[in-house]
C-alpha cells in the first residue's frame, strides 16, 4: 500500500476523520499494537522514538519500554520488509555526553557521517528532528516514509500536501515515485 500525502486538519475538521493520519488509521484497521514511522532512502534509514511532540516533552515521554518496543519493531521491519537477516541498529542518545561509558547511545552529531552509517542498517533516534534532519539533508527529494509494525507493507512520500505550490508546475514527484518503488522492492525481495 502506497499512500499519498493528506491534509490531516482538513480530514479531521472537515470530514470528521477520527484519526490523526494514515498511520493511526491503518494501525487500528490492522489491529496492530503499535506502528512505527521509518524514514528511508538509499543512504539512510531512521526511526524516531517519539514524534510530533515538543522537545521539552521528549525526556518525560521516553521510557525503557517505549525504546525497547521501537527497537523491536524496527528490527522486525528490517528483517521482514527489507530482507536484512541480522539487523544492525544504532541508537542515538538524548544526551550522550552525560558521562556513561557505553558503545551506544551514539552522539547524534557524529553517527550520521558516512563511515558511521556503514556500521548499521537503521538508526533509532529519540525525537522527530534528530531523525529527520539527517535524512532530509542527505536525500531530501527521495525520502520515503515506511510504516513498520503493520501486517502489510505501507509506504508514502516523505512530504506533505504542499498546497503552497499546487498548480505551479514546480512540484517534485521524486519522493512519491521512490515510495512506489520501495513498496515494490519490499513486496518482491
Regions found by a protein language model. Name each.
Residues 1-189:
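Anion-binding alpha/beta catalytic cores of soluble intermediary-metabolism enzymes, centered on
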Amino acid at each position: 500500500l502506497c499512500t499519498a500525502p493528506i491534509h490531516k486538519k482538513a480530514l479531521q475538521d472537515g470530514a470528521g476523520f477520527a484519526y490523526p493520519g494514515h498511520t493511526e488509521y491503518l494501525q487500528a484497521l490492522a489491529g496492530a499494537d503499535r506502528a512505527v514511522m521509518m524514514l528511508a532512502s538509499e543512504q539512510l534509514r531512521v526511526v524516531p522514538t517519539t514524534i510530533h511532540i515538543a522537545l521539552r516533552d521528549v525526556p518525560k515521554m521516553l521510557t525503557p519500554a517505549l525504546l525497547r518496543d521501537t527497537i523491536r519493531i524496527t528490527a522486525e521491519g528490517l528483517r521482514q520488509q527489507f530482507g536484512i537477516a541480522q539487523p544492525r541498529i544504532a541508537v542515538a542518545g538524548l544526551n550522550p555526553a552525560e558521562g556513561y561509558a557505553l558503545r551506544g547511545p551514539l552522539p547524534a552529531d557524529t553517527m550520521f557521517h558516512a563511515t558511521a552509517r556503514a556500521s548499521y542498517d537503521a538508526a533509532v533516534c529519540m525525537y522527530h528532528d534528530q531523525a529527520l534532519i539527517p535524512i532530509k539533508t542527505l536525500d531530501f527529494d527521495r525520502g520515503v516514509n515506511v510504516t513498520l509494525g503493520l501486517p502489510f507493507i505501507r509506504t508514502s512520500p516523505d512530504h506533505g500536501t504542499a498546497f503552497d505550490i499546487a498548480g505551479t508546475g514546480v512540484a517534485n514527484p521524486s519522493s512519491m515515485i521512490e515510495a512506489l518503488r520501495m513498496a515494490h522492492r519490499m513486496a518482491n525481495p
